């Protein structure tokens, strides 16, 4: 049998007719139309509940205590990992050099070097803070930290 355009038909079950609900008990989906009895889901706009609403029970965000805060200082200070300094040329490193190398985001006003990984070059940090471990690693590589 050859395939012809006028003989084409969709596969069985590929196209089903839309179920019409609420059109009499004979259809099997009359009266409540598949929504059950009463409750918010049976009503118009039902099932739309606010995020965090727990049915009248005191919600989790009100049961738990308030803790901590976001430091505005932390937002202004960028963290630079010590191994990232190896991307720069050996020598003097200041805040402008870190910004130029995209190691510090534009919103930051200060930077602090934190120890992670190894240092292979000699750096002189100027006007950039460093943790005790990072300072020791920079000095071990032959560099120095000038506040």
From Swiss-Prot:
The gene is rplO. Gene3D superfamilies: 3.100.10.10. Residues 1-61 are annotated as: Disordered. Binds to the 23S rRNA. InterPro entries: Ribosomal_uL15, Ribosomal_uL15/eL18, Ribosomal_uL15/eL18_sf, Ribosomal_uL15_bac-type, Ribosomal_uL15_CS. One of its GO terms (cellular component) is cytosolic large ribosomal subunit. Part of the 50S ribosomal subunit. NCBIfam families: rplO_bact. SUPFAM superfamilies: Ribosomal proteins L15p and L18e. GO terms for biological process: translation. Belongs to the universal ribosomal protein uL15 family. Residues 34-47 have a biased composition (Basic residues). Residues 1-20 have a biased composition (Basic and acidic residues). Keywords: Ribonucleoprotein, Ribosomal protein, RNA-binding, rRNA-binding. GO terms for molecular function: rRNA binding; structural constituent of ribosome. This is Large ribosomal subunit protein uL15.
């Amino acid at each position: 049998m050859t395939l012809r355009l006028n003989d084409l038909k969709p596969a069985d079950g590929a196209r089903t007719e839309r179920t019409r609900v609420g059109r009499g008990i004979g259809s099997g989906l009359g009266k409540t139309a598949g929504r059950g009895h009463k409750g918010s889901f049976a009503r118009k706009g039902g099932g739309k509940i606010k995020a965090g609403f727990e049915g009248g029970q005191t919600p989790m965000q009100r049961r738990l205590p308030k803790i901590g805060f976001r430091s505005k200082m932390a937002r202004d200070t960028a963290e630079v990992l010590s191994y990232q300094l190896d991307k720069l040329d050996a020598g003097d490193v200041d805040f402008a050099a870190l910004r130029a190398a995209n190691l510090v985001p534009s919103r930051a006003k200060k930077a602090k070097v934190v120890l992670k990984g190894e240092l292979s070059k000699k750096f002189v940090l100027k006007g950039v803070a460093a943790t005790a471990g990072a300072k020791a690693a920079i000095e071990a590589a032959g560099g120095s930290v000038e506040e």
